[in-house]
Amino acid sequence: MTVYNINLGIGWASSGVEYAQAYRAQILRRIQQPAKFIFMDMILADNIQHLTENIGFLDEEIIWLYNYFTDIKIAPTTVTLDQVLAQVAGQPERSEKEGKIVRYFYPQDDQFITCYLRQEDQDSVEHVEYVSRGRLIRKDYFSYVRYASEYFAPHNDAATLYQRRFYHEDGSVAYDMLIEDGQEKLYRFPDRIFYSKAELVRYFLQCLQLQADDVVILDRETGIGQVVFEESQKAKLGVVVHAEHFSENASSDDYILWNNFYDYQFTNADKVDFFIVATEAQKRILEQQFQHYSDKQPQIATIPVGSLDQLTYPKEPRKPYSMITASRLATEKHIDWLVAATVQAHAQLPELTLDIYGKGSEEDKLRRRIEEAGAQDYIRLKGHADLSQIYAGYELYLTASTSEGFGLTLMEAVGSGLPLIGFDVRYGNQTFIDDGKNGYLLPVSSNHVEDQIIAAFVEKIIALFSQGRQQEMSQHSYQVAENYLTSRVEAAWTQLLKEVRDDSAL
């Protein structure tokens, strides 16, 4: 029995879906359940191994769709500059280095190559661009060997990608992919041709040779849902619901508008062996909705998408008046509201600090806001970090997200005994924040009046630090966190997979 977990992409600023999968990988390892994590997107900006290792996957757990048809293993980049140069005819006349970019010039051939290093202080090359007569003609991608190339031709005075090639370890061609208008149009193998990605995905799933006791867990389905459903029927199919699954405002007693990311799965729920949600509240709502709006009654299991190996206690006293938030720095996380609230609250609590962990598209904008407020001394952007031992140094966790399917950072925060302040929204905040006991739930309205929101945060921040209840609230957070200890989540996964195995044996 193997558990195959299907996702689309992964990046350095991964979403909660990828972190949920990484937690799941740890749990499945601990209960000795063989598992694979499959990524279906084209990922060439970075070696996928660097991205998956970064959040805790093991190389042998990873299947990348486009690499699957080769004999090249998922592995870190180790090809060196010297190895790259050895494959280029002639000797470079000069070179330039700036950060992680090294450029070699061959004026006798009117060409240069640009090497992109994995790290500035190393000579491992992730990919190389070849420019001839001022035009980009090829890119090569490396791990421990070259695993892919992209070919370009001039079109409308711009380099246009027209072909990708994937290799075996010995350098022979595994297959070619033809590109038209930036879209994958054709996949040419030595013994077959596919004319769409759907056909390629179907062939891939058939190559897995799924058995009755295998389990396919679909984490994201955009563009692949129908094929996965059809090819997984010989195994057991599970679907994980990672977010709010319906639009409350657009639903009525006669009609429900499912979240478009789950519409296909819910519409075809009779083909699903089980759904997984992260909270009991979401399970209750989804069960009621299936009863009310459909004739399908699928199995729904509640399994937290993360877990805590143990509760974490501070090794030294927490820093007074210290606050932390952690998330992707994206617009929907509304970190700007937390910055504004901290600036206002700081006027009354001059020792107040806020550390912001995470990376994302809003980072530069947030940095400017902090600088414009003159708040650099007490609001800091901390980037990515392993937060497991960091939370316990703070006194309060803030979240301004208006929708959180579970909230891994909320779980981690209560596991380190932090009180929390966030909106009274399903499901994560209402699960981890017991209003008035380990923090505060703030009212939220659909129109998001910014001044009112910021004022509400300011009021509760000042209240929490002024009432002297931090220790009492901290203890209540630890009590909430006990429900998410790894031992309990392991038991939930063991039970679900046992039920699946028993059912497949019938």
From Swiss-Prot:
Disruption phenotype: Loss of export of cell wall protein GspB; transcription should not be affected. Non-glycosylated GspB may form aggregates.
A GO MF label: nucleotide binding
The protein, known as: UDP-N-acetylglucosamine--peptide N-acetylglucosaminyltransferase GtfA subunit
Disulfide-bonded cysteines: none
Binding residues for N-acetyl-D-glucosamine: H242, G405, F406, G407
Main location as per UniProt: cytoplasm
Family per similarity comment: Belongs to the glycosyltransferase group 1 family. Glycosyltransferase 4 subfamily.
CDD domains named among the record's database cross-references: GT4_GtfA-like (cd04949)
Top-rank taxon, per record: Bacteria
Reaction equation(s) it catalyzes: L-seryl-[protein] + UDP-N-acetyl-alpha-D-glucosamine = 3-O-[N-acetyl-alpha-D-glucosaminyl]-L-seryl-[protein] + UDP + H(+)
Keyword Transferase set for record: yes
Range of residues in the leader sequence: none
Keyword ATP-binding: no
Residues that bind UDP: G16, V17, E18, Y19, R328, Y357, G383, H384, A385, T409
Positions of region (C-terminus R-fold-1): 196-306
Bilayer topology: Peripheral membrane protein
Region annotation R-fold-2: where it falls in the sequence: 307-506
Region described as N-terminus R-fold-1: spans on this chain: 1-78
Protein encoded by which gene: gtfA
Domain comment in the entry: Has 2 Rossmann-like domains, called R-fold-1 and R-fold-2. R-fold-1 is interrupted by an extended beta-sheet domain that loops out of the structure. UDP and N-acetyl-D-glucosamine bind between the Rossman-like folds, which move closer together upon binding.
Alphabetical UniProt keywords: Cell membrane, Cytoplasm, Glycosyltransferase, Membrane, Nucleotide-binding, Transferase
Enzyme class, broadest EC rank: transferase
GO biological process, alphabetically ordered: protein O-linked glycosylation; protein O-linked glycosylation via serine
Stretches the record annotates as Extended beta-sheet domain: 79-195
Native organism: Streptococcus gordonii
